[in-house]
Structures are given as structure tokens and as C-alpha cells.
Amino acid sequence: HTDFFTSIGHMTDLINTEKDLVISKLKDYIKAEESKLEQIKKWAEKLDKLTDTATKDPEGFLGHPANAFKLMKRLNTEWGELESLVLKDMSDGFISNMTIQRQFFPNDEDQTGARKALLRLQDTYNLDTDTLSRGNLPGVKHKSFLTAEDCFELGKIRYTEADYYHTELWMEQALKQLDEGEVSSADKVYILDYLSYAVYQQGDLSKAMMLTKRLLELDPEHQRANGNMKYFEYIMAKEKEANKSSTDAEDQTDKETEVKKKDYLPERRKYEMLCRGEGLKMTPRRQKRLFCRYYDGNRNPRYILGPVKQEDEWDKPRIVRFLDIISDEEIETVKELAKPRLSRATVHDPETGKLTTAHYRVSKSAWLSGYESPVVSRINTRIQDLTGLDVSTAEELQVANYGVGGQYEPHFDFGRKDEPDAFKELGTGNRIATWLFYMSDVSAGGATVFPEVGASVWPKKGTAVFWYNLFPSGEGDYSTRHAACPVLVGNKWVSNKWLHERGQEFRRPCTLSELE
């Protein structure tokens, strides 16, 4: 497996691997080392008593021929055996096992991906560093703490990205935990070095000087800190003369740039607000248009006597949710079929029309065909019956499992006019509609949001949502731009069916209006 961080499902395998290493391999190695040490200790204790007696009366001791013989034997043979025992490497078995297992361990990319996921969650859900570090997240079953070293590492990631605001937050958290007495390999001098520079870059000169002074108290010979201190004093003197800080001017420029960037990316703010549940609140008048009902698939014979529960989630675009539409047994079957095939989820490259991985889609997916399992075939039939659309031209059922902070940033499911080759290889036209199963509950986060209209749809196991991506005319509905929010706590499994235009000519015909 690769890209472990993109799938919680695959990361569970790592827990079992680690347990096996600890229980059978590492403990066996410890026992072997303890046994070896015990033999050496017994030898030392025996010789301690013997030499203590012998040195009190060497001639009398050696006057006994057996003692003389045993001395010769010990020095010639037994000390050599002890040397061999000391030199015996008990780690061979453990090391060989480790070498085999490490082939399947996460790599640097996985560690970086997990680090970035934590930072992404912090931004999206407005979490302060103390909340993340103390593990005080909603719905957690197993609380976990970040060490000062962990906080320092996260701060360094932000530093390399020139994000000095978050660098300051994480370095301060690391320093706080060390000041509270946490024992760590993290060094206060290193932390203060990064922290003072991050604070200076944001224009707070007096705080930068205070932190640098504290650093110099710990390490008076620190070259960079001494140089920085002189520079800060020079800048401070210039401030007093001009009564205006050039640093403040730089800070103001940074702030203006930041505001421009934020204004330039309004969708990002909408997306994050929706993920936090701060979305658009429907007016009572609009809410009255939303209903729940028993739905029989337009008099479909399979559902006339046993209609399904359907709820309106949104009016424009129309998003409906089907409740109790997939059983726990079906979910487990789909997951078991998909797990061995899960690979890093891809997106369509608009320039090449080919599939490629992307940093904004953090999940793993697998494709299941109807002929592989009666369960998948039954699910496909159910989708066809309830949507009234032909699934023979649809894509295979895609199963996705999200990773650490797993997400899929805002995107369209359909190919736009400037992407004429998006689904050319399939030969079935554009994606007319999307059917999305939620196959797990998520403790926190993981909503499906529509930034253009302000809709948030929250995961609920056993339900499915459905919407049309195209108008009856075949034009794309740009209000269906949507995203999967980062998973804050939990393990998110979904499966989706993309239905295509071909085969729907008489099932969803064009209307008389060009605008629809």
C-alpha cells in the first residue's frame, strides 16, 4: 500500500502490524536480552563472592589444587565463553522482522500528509492550538495528546510555508507545554528562535525582542539571536526617531495583501463556514417548500407496496435524501469488496482528460461492477428504480474511504464546456446526475457542502442523496458545485454512482424551454 494517510481504512492495517511487532517481535527480543543479562549478572555475582574470598588469602586459596585448576579453567575458557555471550547479538531476529515489515510502513509523504491534515482541520474548523494539542475534539472516543515536539514540528511546517501567524501559534503551544514541565526532546532555544522570527515577521517588534532576550538567557552565545537583537534595537531606535515603524508599514502591506487574497477566494470562506455548520439559513417561506414523503419511484412495481422514505434537503438545486436505503449487511459487503482495491482517489485533468491524483482530494477509492457481486447488482437496480434513469451507461459504483482530515475541495461532477474531452473515453456523454451513499456515521465534520447555494448535507449511515448535475437541456447546473469537508473525527465511507446522458433520452427528455 502507498499513501496510507489518504484512507483510515488502510491505516487500520498499520495498527495491527504495529501490535504484532510489539506483542510478538519486540517482546521476544526484550525477553532474549533480559535472559542474556540475567546470565551475565549470575556470573558476576558468583565471581564477586569467589574473588572476595580468594583475595583475602591468595596463597591459602590456591593451596587447594581444585581452586588452582578452576582458576586456570575460568581464565582460559569461561571468560572466553562470557565474552562470546556479551558479544552475542540478540537483535538479529527482531531486526530481520523489522526490515521485512518496514517495506509496508508509511513514508515521509504519509507523515507530511498527516501533518498537513491536522493543520487543515485547524483552519477549516477554527480550532485553537491548545484544543488540538489536548485532544479536546467533539465525539472522540480515544483522547490523544500532542507533545511539545509534535507542536514544534507543526510550527516548522507552517514556517516553511511562510505562514508566520500559525507558526507563532504552534511554537507558543510548544513553549507553553515545556514551561508547564513536560519532558521532551524539543529544545526551548530552537523554539524561541523560530517564534521570535515569526513574531517579527508579523510586525510585533517589542514581543520579538522580549522572546530573543529570553533565548539569550538560555544561550548567551547564540549567534543569530545576538545578531537579531542588535538589528531589533537598531529598528527600535529608528522608530523613535521617525515616530513611525517601517515594520508596521510592512505589516499593513501584508494585511492588505491578505485581505485581497481573502476577497479573491470568497468560495474558500463559504466552504469552511459550511463545513462548520455556519451555512445559509433558509427563510421560513423556502423551508415550507421542503417535504418528506414515502416515495414509490413513480409507481415502480418494486416500491408500490414498500415505498422508501425520502426527504428534501434543498430546493435549488433539488437535493433529496433517501433514508434506510442501504442495509448494514450491504454496506459491509461493499466495504470488504473495495478494501483490497483501494488506491489514491483521482480527478479528471481538464487539460489531458486523464485521471490524476490531486492534493485537494484526500481519500482512496475503488470501483465495483454489478457482475462481481449480487449485492452490487442489487444496489445498481435500486438506483435505477428510484431515479428512473438507465444505469447501463453509468459508471461503476465508486467506493471511497477518507483519510486523516480527508476531503475533496469544491468541484463539479459534470464536464464543463471548456472540458469537452472529460468523459470522451466512456462514450456515454456527460454526468447527468449523482447518487451518493453514506456508509458510515462521522463523529465530527465530513459534510457534503454546496458553496454556491449555501447547502450542507451531513453524513448519516444508511442514507443516500441524489441530485441532477445537468438541466434537461444538457447544460451544466453550476449551482451543484460541491465539496466533501475534512473529516474532523471518525472514519468516513461513501459510495457514489455517476449516471450519464446516454440512455436517458426518453427517461429525462428536454423541455420546451432553452433555459432548462
Curated annotation (Swiss-Prot):
Stretches forming TPR repeats: 189-222
Residues binding Fe cation, per UniProt: 411, 413, 482
Pfam families in UniProt: 2OG-FeII_Oxy_3, P4Ha_N, TPR_P4H
Ranges for domain Fe2OG dioxygenase: 393-501
Cofactors named for this entry: Fe(2+); L-ascorbate
E.C. number: 1.14.11.2
Cofactor mode of binding and number, as noted: Binds 1 Fe(2+) ion per subunit.
Reactions it catalyzes: L-prolyl-[collagen] + 2-oxoglutarate + O2 = trans-4-hydroxy-L-prolyl-[collagen] + succinate + CO2
Places the protein is found: Endoplasmic reticulum lumen
Binding site for 2-oxoglutarate: 492
InterPro entries attached to this UniProt entry: Oxoglu/Fe-dep_dioxygenase_dom, P4HA-like, Pro_4_hyd_alph, Pro_4_hyd_alph_FE2OG_OXY, Pro_4_hyd_alph_N, TPR-like_helical_dom_sf, TPR_rpt
Any one Gene Ontology BP term: collagen fibril organization
Keyword annotations of the record: Dioxygenase, Endoplasmic reticulum, Glycoprotein, Iron, Metal-binding, Oxidoreductase, TPR repeat, Vitamin C
A molecular function GO annotation: procollagen-proline 4-dioxygenase activity
PROSITE patterns cross-referenced by the UniProt entry: FE2OG_OXY, TPR, TPR_REGION
Glycosylated residues (UniProt): 97, 243
Record-level GO cellular component terms: endoplasmic reticulum; endoplasmic reticulum lumen
Enzymatic class: oxidoreductase
Similarity comment: Belongs to the P4HA family.
The protein's role, per its UniProt record: Catalyzes the post-translational formation of 4-hydroxyproline in -Xaa-Pro-Gly- sequences in collagens and other proteins.
Subunit structure: Heterotetramer of two alpha chains and two beta chains (the beta chain is the multi-functional PDI).
Protein name per the record: Prolyl 4-hydroxylase subunit alpha-1
Species, as recorded: Gallus gallus (Chicken)
Organism placement in taxonomy: Eukaryota, Metazoa, Chordata, Craniata, Vertebrata
